[in-house]
């Protein structure tokens, strides 16, 4: 997941990106999160979903465990409570040009997640206000999110031209090139 050019003029409240927010409803979930420790770059939830933060995103990460969180809602003056954990990326008040990078790995375990963190299997080719382009190093896939009509694209990519904003995913197959 990539985010680019995050900005606003709100100086009263901080801006954040939520990576995950999970309710701890069962006793098993409580026990899991009570004993949970992260290295600050990788997180794994009790469902086996792993989260990897790039080095630049770890600086703004905020992990919170709220057992319980008591809130008074907008529609009722009666307090409600619940137990939850969250991971957010903090961009500050009135951010200008903030960005983030993280990966979500479903059906993983702690060992596989740590291995991924040591050697991520993707490469960000472009991350700016015009495009997010990411290449998977394991399966020859390149994903393009073009926000604007691109002026330039990576020279070594199969997508050489686009006349509008679009989403494109291309798998290179050198064995079947014509």
Please provide the spans of the model-predicted regions.
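Short conserved micro-motifs at the rims of enzyme active sites and ligand-binding pockets
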Residues: 30, 63-65, 113-115
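Trp/Gly-enriched beta-strand surface patches
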Residues: 33-88, 154
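Catalytic and substrate-binding regions of extracellular carbohydrate-active enzymes
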Residues: 1-33
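Short Pro-Gly-centered flexible turn/kink motifs
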Residues: 95-106
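Secondary-structure transition/turn motif
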Residues: 5-7, 67, 135-141
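A structural signal for short secondary-structure junctions
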Residues: 10-13, 79-81, 93-97, 171-174
């Amino acid at each position: 997941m990539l985010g680019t050019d995050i900005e606003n003029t709100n100086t009263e409240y901080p801006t954040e990106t939520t990576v995950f927010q999970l309710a701890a409803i069962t006793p098993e979930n409580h026990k899991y999160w009570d004993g949970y420790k992260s290295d600050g770059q990788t997180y794994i939830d009790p469902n086996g979903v792993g989260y990897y933060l790039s080095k630049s995103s770890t600086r703004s990460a905020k992990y919170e465990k709220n057992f319980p969180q008591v809130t008074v809602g907008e529609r009722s003056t009666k307090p409600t409570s619940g137990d939850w954990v969250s991971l957010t990326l903090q961009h500050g008040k009135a951010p200008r040009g903030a960005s983030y990078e993280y990966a979500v790995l479903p059906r993983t375990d702690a060992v596989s997640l740590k291995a991924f963190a040591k050697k991520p299997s993707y490469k960000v080719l472009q991350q700016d206000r015009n495009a997010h382009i990411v290449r998977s190093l394991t399966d020859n896939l390149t994903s393009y999110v073009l926000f604007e009509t691109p002026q330039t694209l990576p020279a070594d990519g199969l997508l050489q031209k686009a006349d509008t904003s679009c989403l494109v995913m291309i798998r290179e197959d050198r064995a079947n090139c014509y």
